[in-house]
Amino acid sequence: LRKLFENEVIDQTTYELALAEKLPGKPFPLPEITPHLTEKLRNDHKGTQLTSTINYSLQQQINEIARKNYEALRQNEIHNLAILILDVNTREVLAYLGNSPTTAEHDHFVDIIQRPRSTGSILKPFLYTAMLDEGSLLPHTLVADVPTSVNGYSPQNFDKEFNGAVPASVALAKSLNVPAVRMLQDYGLQKFYHQLEKLQQKNINKSAGYYGLSLILGGAESSLWGITNAYAGMASTLNHFNSSSSEYKPKEFLEPIYKLNKKADFGKNQFQPEVFHAGAIYHTLKTLEEVNRPSGEENWNFFS
């Protein structure tokens, strides 16, 4: 201030008034409740002030859940995780945790929600739904779980065992690989690829032939953002069907919303679904309720 006054940048009155003011307190660090979403907002909407749809209480809960699980998982050299929670009815992002509270050595700054990763077995329910939808499969239809080789490709189940003939619903609940490959071959690779396009799996962007039958076993990549939205779209299809006298919306698989006061436009009611009929979705979701839990958690439903 003295230099400004001596150099006649400010007059004496301004100088004396400035000296009389109390010094401001030191700035406190900004809360890092959801840093990866903050970075996404900054990149997507530069120079714009906006309010997110994040539920503060829920976000704090998942941050704590992630912290506790990270402490356990890192003992097994698992250093990264992500959590995304959407409201199925509004498609709003309620909680967004892009990575674990790990270190820079393990890339804590990387937003795993947006990064493409191997799909593993997460596409199997889509294939099951598609086959139910066209009538080529029923939940109790027996599918073969036997040694299989297709043009030199020989899928294996996780336990390296074969179960013979199993109901399709059981094959999905147990996430059996061999039946999934055989089902994809029966349904049609190209046809399933087009279904994934309808489900907005934008990271699966090479030709169907490039992926081959391994598409159903993690041979492709998708993001948690895209996968979560696809499952939300299926649930939303069922919800709208049940609440609208058996009608559908034309835009069930629209992008998740993270800006407050932006409303999802699912379109006007129609008689045909955007992708899958409600009945096929219902049976798929019921089957997924029977998914085997890890060893030691078999009786989870008694405590839920």
Task: Show the residue positions of the predicted features.
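A penicillin-recognizing enzyme superfamily signal
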Residues: S52-L73, I83-D87, Y96, T103-I113, ...
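Short, small/polar residue-rich loop motifs at catalytic or cofactor-binding pockets
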Residues: E77-N80
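Short, well-structured active-site flanking segments
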Residues: D11-E16, F109, L132-V150, Y187-Y193, ...
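Conserved catalytic neighborhood of penicillin-recognizing serine enzymes
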Residues: P27-R42, L137-F192, S236, Y258-E290
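Active-site SXXK
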Residues: L4, I62, R91, I112-V143, ...
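Second-shell loop/turn segments in exported
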Residues: L1, F5, P24-F28, H45-T53, ...
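Non-catalytic, structured segments within soluble enzyme domains
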Residues: L1-Q60, E64, Q156, H194-A208, ...
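Peptidoglycan glycan-strand catalytic modules in the bacterial/periplasmic cell-wall system
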Residues: L1-V9, P101-A104, V170-N177, Q185-G188, ...
